[in-house]
Swiss-Prot record:
Gene that encodes the chain: sthA
GO terms classed as biological process: 2-oxoglutarate metabolic process; NADP metabolic process
Protein name, as recorded: Soluble pyridine nucleotide transhydrogenase
Cofactor details (free text): Binds 1 FAD per subunit.
Location of this chain's protein in the cell: Cytoplasm
Main location group: cytoplasm
The reaction(s) this protein catalyses: NAD(+) + NADPH = NADH + NADP(+)
InterPro entries: Class-I_Pyr_Nuc-Dis_Oxidored, FAD/NAD-bd_sf, FAD/NAD-binding_dom, FAD/NAD-linked_Rdtase_dimer_sf, Pyr_nuc-diS_OxRdtase, Pyr_nucl-diS_OxRdtase_dimer, STH_gammaproteobact
Enzyme class: oxidoreductase
Length: 466
């Protein structure tokens, strides 16, 4: 029998954006319903995206570390693992994350509904369950936090057993010797690192002229060199004409006339917002061609009581930002305005092997803006801690204003880059004279640490001034 419920707010989706909104609302006394399509909370971030891919990367990087460390490699011992082996590690992490996040909802008395959500009208949502039954939920406010999914061109047969996207790759049931990755964005580059780390041949097909063009060019070049040095074949400025599935593999026909054959294909070229099926047309909302919704600074759509957060609104499409967007939307919903906002310089972490992380401006940005900047560099191979642990590939680069010494950008390539970046970010976020590269010279760091790279880079940069 269909039931009817009323809430202060309904949150559609339980990924980072939905969780941030739901927790922000219940902490302010709201009665909240959360609708999740799948049986487990966490969204794509937990089950198909961020968490499993980073768990896979960690397992592979530890294998590489063991095999390259002189303590072990001098004994002619090596270890190896298959993709299915390291998937077990990812599954354990996913289960831990799911239990923890379910606990958040339970402790905060969010009422959960496991089904597909669609609008009946601007304040009413239908929840359709797997058994075909329905419930009707009404609320004063609604948050759309449905995330995104891999883009699937109509002319690619994703039903073929050797053609995967970044969600279905976790269901890989065979052991490929050769993989084609179509799309050299963040996801494509991360999986190129994972497969190559497992000694799988990798062809990385890039539709652009260089890898991760939004990065500082030195970081992009460093990744390209590292891939080349480890045997990844990168094909720039290429697009597919046809993707042909065969009995035992895939052939990619490129518009340039080339052909590439491998055991399987990972298609990782773009994502689209999860808005189809929501019934947006019933409330007068329309997503763009990529399935994304437009919002204002308080994450309100064209309907002031309907909010949208996370990947479904596009940039920056980061789990960390989605959670903050959800909290800000919750505050705006309850108080009528948001006292906080996303920071201007959001750090990016790219979990290739080695990692890349950046915050602030690139050298290309500052040159185009005609800002008089200087560069301070530290090579990891010169740091005692890096030498001790055997991870001496990488560098830290600090960009700062020649006259004010204000830090303008920080770029790191190497193991633990995504952690190291936050030290510099904390100083960059200081107001006025608190943001200065001299902080790193005048502060005593633990020794030996990777954080010492900031002191080395600061001294290097300041020594360039005249």
């Amino acid at each position: 029998m269909q039931q009817h419920f009323h809430f202060d707010a309904i949150v559609i989706g339980s990924g980072p954006g939905g969780e941030g909104a739901a927790m922000g609302l219940v902490k302010q006394g709201a009665r909240v319903a959360v609708i999740e399509r799948y049986n487990n909370v966490g969204g794509g971030c937990t089950h198909w995206g961020t968490i499993p891919s980073k768990a896979l990367r960690h397992a592979v990087s530890r294998i590489i570390e063991f095999n390259q460390n002189p303590l072990y490699s001098d004994n002619a011992r090596t270890i190896s693992s298959s993709f299915s082996d390291i998937l077990n590690h990812a599954d354990r992490v996913i289960n831990q994350q799911t239990r923890m996040r379910q606990g958040f909802y339970d402790r905060n008395h969010c009422q959960m509904f496991s089904g597909d959500a669609s609008f009946i009208d601007a304040n009413t949502i239908n929840v359709r369950y797997a058994d075909g039954t329905n419930d009707t939920l009404r609320a004063d406010n609604i948050v759309i936090a449905t995330g995104s999914r891999p883009y699937r061109p109509a002319n690619v047969d994703f039903t073929h057993e050797r053609i995967y996207d970044s969600d279905t790759i976790l269901q890989l049931s065979h052991e490929p010797q050769h993989v084609i990755i179509y799309g050299a964005g963040v996801i494509g580059c991360e999986y190129a690192s994972i497969f190559r780390g497992l000694s799988v041949k990798v062809d990385l097909i890039n539709t652009r002229d260089r890898l991760l063009a939004f990065l500082d060019q030195e970081m992009s070049d460093a990744l390209s060199y590292h891939f080349w040095n480890n045997g990844v074949v990168i094909r720039h400025n290429e697009e597919f004409e046809q993707i042909e599935g065969t009995v035992d593999g895939v052939i990619v026909h490129l518009k340039s006339g080339k052909k590439v054959k491998a055991d399987c294909l990972l298609y990782a070229n773009g994502r689209t917002g999860n808005t189809s099926g929501l019934g947006l047309e019933k409330i007068g909302l329309e997503a763009d061609s990529r399935g994304l919704l437009k919002v204002n600074s308080m994450y309100q759509t064209a309907l002031s009581h309907v909010y949208a957060v996370g990947d479904v609104i596009g940039y920056p499409s980061l789990a960390s930002a989605a959670y903050d967007q959800g909290r800000i939307a919750a505050q705006a919903m309850i108080k009528g305005e948001a006292n906080t906002h996303l920071i201007e310089d959001i750090p990016t972490g790219i979990y290739t092997i080695p990692e890349i992380s950046s915050v602030g401006k690139t050298e290309q940005d500052l040159t185009a803006m005609k800002v008089p900047y200087e560069v301070g560099r530290a090579q990891f191979k010169h740091l005692a801690r890096a030498q001790i642990v055997g991870m001496d590939t990488g560098s830290l680069k600090i960009l700062f204003h020649r006259e004010t010494k204000q830090i303008l950008g920080i770029h790191c390539f190497g193991e633990r880059a995504a952690e190291i970046i936050h030290i510099g970010q904390a100083i960059m976020e200081q107001k006025g004279e608190g943001n200065t590269i001299e902080y790193f010279v005048n502060t005593t760091f633990n020794y030996p640490t990777m954080a010492e790279a900031y002191r080395v880079a600061a001294l290097n940069g300041l020594n360039r001034l005249f």
